[in-house]
């Protein structure tokens, strides 16, 4: 009887503690508005012009914690966080060097930590702002904010506190920057410590034009087994793109779609048991737009193991790229290759994604 009583007390204590934890997490859950106007730090004075060459880079930097020596538990690896602050700092220095090595008018970055246990509380938004210097404005939108992420279940590897999101840096004057919450969410209680996906829309005036340039930074859902989140996010994006096309604006969407582009289907067959990126439907792209991707180089690797290009278990994807409106001309990036986006093959040294760069101009009279 005494043993049963002890068991009951222990069991009830666990239930009460778990309930209290979920209650606190639910109370503290990040609940963003559907539309949030964002501050533009250090906004620039330079105004866009038609028929002027512009450059852009998209780069999921993986919070400087997913470089060549790392794996990740959600991808079939073992780690929840990098092993030390030195590891993160080394990757972060490499990431900043890459940004400086490929100067761009616009940088659209994903998985940038403002403050998080997994990146040892390094303010990466500020670090990149400082590295780029005074010629860039900074815009940041949350898509992951939680006081405690209890995953993976481990005394040392748990993710813990997270403030993270997407960041856009620009050398031209940005008239407004807005965070749009994407539809769909995981069910409670998974929802309380999970990502709240969004797009960040930067609007820029253009000299001698009644239309504007819309730069859209995004990072769409990945671990969505049913595909329902993806469907809702893509439907939202499509509707927004149709609206902008009808108004005649110039549009560049860039980021990590976490989906395989139609032109890239079948290039990297997914091995059995590994994460598979949904394919973007052929019918998704609205009239007046086209994809701009590089099919010659993978943009992402799976984190089921540290990077080993000779291993049969190394899985690649092409899930990072652009959507561009037809009133924009895309140029050759290096003057050698054909016109189009170009993925920078950096050997996944500092992140599990490669940067994708592009040069373009806004057509006059469109």
Regions found by a protein language model. Name each.
Residues 2-131, 140-155, 159, 163, ...:
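N-terminal, active-site-proximal structural segment of metallo-dependent hydrolase catalytic domains
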Residues 5, 21-44, 242-252, 258-366:
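Metal-dependent phosphoester-hydrolase catalytic domains
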Residues 35, 146-212:
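A well-ordered secondary-structure block
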Residues 55-61, 91-121, 169, 202-204, ...:
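Active-site beta-strand/loop signature of hydrolases that rely on acidic residues for catalysis
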Residues 64-65, 114-117, 146-148, 187, ...:
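Active-site environment of divalent metal-dependent phosphoester hydrolases
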Residues 78-84, 112-115, 182-191, 219-228:
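Surface-exposed cleft-lining segments at the edges of enzyme active sites
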Residues 130-133, 160-177, 204-205, 313-330, ...:
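Conserved beta strand-loop-helix elements of the APE1-like EEP
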Residues 137-145, 177-183, 333-337:
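Conserved S-adenosyl-L-methionine
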């Amino acid at each position: 009887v005494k043993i049963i009583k002890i068991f009951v007390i222990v069991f009830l204590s666990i239930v009460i503690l778990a309930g209290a934890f979920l209650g606190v997490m639910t109370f503290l859950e990040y609940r963003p508005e559907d539309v949030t106007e964002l501050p533009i730090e250090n906004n620039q004075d330079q105004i866009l012009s038609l028929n002027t060459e512009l450059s852009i880079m998209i780069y999921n930097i993986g919070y400087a914690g997913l470089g060549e020596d790392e794996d990740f538990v959600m991808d079939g690896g073992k780690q929840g966080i990098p092993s030390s602050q030195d590891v993160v700092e080394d990757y972060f220095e490499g990431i900043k060097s890459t940004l400086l090595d490929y100067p761009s008018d616009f940088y659209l970055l994903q998985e940038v930590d403002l403050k998080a246990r997994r990146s040892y509380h390094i303010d990466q938004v500020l670090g990149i702002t400082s590295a780029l210097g005074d010629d860039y404005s900074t815009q940041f939108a949350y898509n992951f904010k939680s006081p405690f992420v209890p995953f993976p279940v481990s005394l040392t590897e748990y993710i813990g506190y997270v403030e993270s999101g997407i960041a856009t840096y620009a050398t031209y004057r940005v008239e407004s920057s807005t965070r749009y919450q994407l539809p769909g969410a995981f069910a409670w209680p998974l929802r309380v410590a999970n990502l709240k996906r969004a797009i960040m829309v930067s609007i820029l005036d253009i000299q001698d034009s009644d239309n504007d340039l819309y730069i859209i930074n995004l990072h769409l859902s990945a671990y969505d087994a049913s595909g329902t989140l993806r469907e809702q996010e893509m439907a939202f994006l499509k509707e927004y793109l149709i609206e902008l096309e009808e108004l005649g604006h110039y549009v560049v969407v860039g980021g990590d779609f976490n989906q395989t582009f139609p032109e890239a289907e079948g290039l990297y067959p997914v091995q059995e048991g590994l994460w598979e990126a949904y394919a973007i439907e052929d019918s998704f792209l609205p009239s007046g737009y086209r994809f701009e991707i590089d099919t010659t180089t993978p943009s992402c690797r799976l984190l089921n193991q540290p990077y080993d290009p000779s291993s049969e278990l190394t899985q690649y994807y092409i899930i990072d790229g652009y959507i561009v409106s037809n009133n924009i001309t895309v140029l050759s990036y290096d003057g050698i290759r054909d016109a189009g986006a170009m993925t920078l093959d950096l050997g996944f040294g500092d992140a599990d994604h490669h940067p994708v760069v592009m040069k373009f101009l806004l057509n006059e009279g469109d």
